[in-house]
């Protein structure tokens, strides 16, 4: 991640929202450059670390929270759960998300694992921790990303605009007290991981439920269709 001002790295609305943690973002950039200098790589690639914040802040209607990026080289792209279009086979969690997507909405299975269309339509795909060492899950937890992503979520709730948070798993559920401060409704279920998907993720219908809640709040629904 290059040493550049925050307003050159993210969308203008997000630059304002993240201003309280601008120094922390800069410190995380220093941390990542130190990792590279020490011969330790990180994922996703530098230009994608803040990718979730390159889509319009004011247009976010749904928040989907992940834990940290995929640790498999070639998978992480800076949007939670998403992968590059050429990744095959899909990560198991994403395959389970698509199984529920098809069952919930009746759409055919997507042709690839790229969730960019959701990000472009007002879905913030945000990991709590924005980087990871390759093949070392959770290796950057506690290194300093959590205050940044918490600030982002607090900024969303402070808008007092309709927001639906889709919280998959226990880690994501810890955000409920923050989300309760705004005009936000949370949908909770177990994580789509193979370890927990059969314990309540399948059949939870998060996509149609999110749209129903948005409509009840007077907001436009999300077009969840993927190519």
From Swiss-Prot:
Q: Supply the Pfam families for this chain.
A: UDG
Per its UniProt record, what PROSITE patterns does this chain match? U_DNA_GLYCOSYLASE
Keyword field: Cytoplasm, DNA damage, DNA repair, Hydrolase
The UniProt entry lists the main location of this chain as cytoplasm
Q: What is its EC number?
A: 3.2.2.27
Identify the GO cellular component terms for this protein. cytoplasm
This protein's record includes keyword Ubl conjugation? no
Active site: residue positions: 68
State one molecular function term (GO).
Answer: uracil DNA N-glycosylase activity
Family matches, as CDD domains: UDG-F1-like
Q: Record's superkingdom?
A: Bacteria
For this protein, what reaction is catalysed? Hydrolyzes single-stranded DNA or mismatched double-stranded DNA and polynucleotides, releasing free uracil
One GO term of the biological process aspect? base-excision repair, AP site formation via deaminated base removal
**Keyword DNA repair attached:** yes
UniProt family annotation: Belongs to the uracil-DNA glycosylase (UDG) superfamily. UNG family.
Q: What does this protein do?
A: Excises uracil residues from the DNA which can arise as a result of misincorporation of dUMP residues by DNA polymerase or due to deamination of cytosine.
Q: Which protein, by its recorded name, is this? A: Uracil-DNA glycosylase
Organism of this sequence? Mycolicibacterium paratuberculosis (strain ATCC BAA-968 / K-10)
| Gene symbol of the encoding locus | ung
């Amino acid at each position: 991640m290059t040493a550049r001002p925050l307003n050159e790295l993210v969308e203008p609305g997000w630059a304002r929202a993240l201003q309280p943690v601008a120094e922390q973002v800069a410190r995380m950039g220093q941390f990542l450059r130190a990792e590279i200098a020490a011969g330790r790589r990180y994922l996703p690639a530098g230009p994608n670390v803040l990718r979730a914040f390159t889509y319009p802040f004011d247009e976010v209607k749904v928040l989907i929270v992940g834990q940290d990026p995929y640790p498999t080289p070639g998978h992480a792209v800076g949007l939670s759960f998403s992968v590059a279009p050429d990744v095959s086979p899909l990560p198991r969690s994403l395959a389970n998300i698509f199984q529920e997507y098809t069952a919930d909405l009746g759409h055919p299975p997507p042709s690839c694992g790229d969730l960019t269309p959701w990000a472009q339509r007002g879905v913030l795909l945000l990991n709590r921790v924005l980087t990871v060492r390759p093949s070392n899950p959770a290796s950057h937890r506690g290194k300093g990303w959590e205050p940044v992503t918490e600030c982002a979520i607090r900024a969303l709730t402070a808008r007092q605009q309709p927001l639906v948070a889709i919280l998959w798993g226990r880690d994501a559920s810890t955000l409920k007290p923050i989300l309760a401060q705004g005009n936000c409704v949370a949908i909770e279920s177990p994580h789509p991981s193979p370890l927990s998907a059969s314990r309540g993720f399948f059949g939870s219908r998060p996509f149609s439920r999110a749209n129903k809640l948005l409509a009840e709040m007077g907001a436009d629904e999300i077009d969840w269709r993927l190519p």
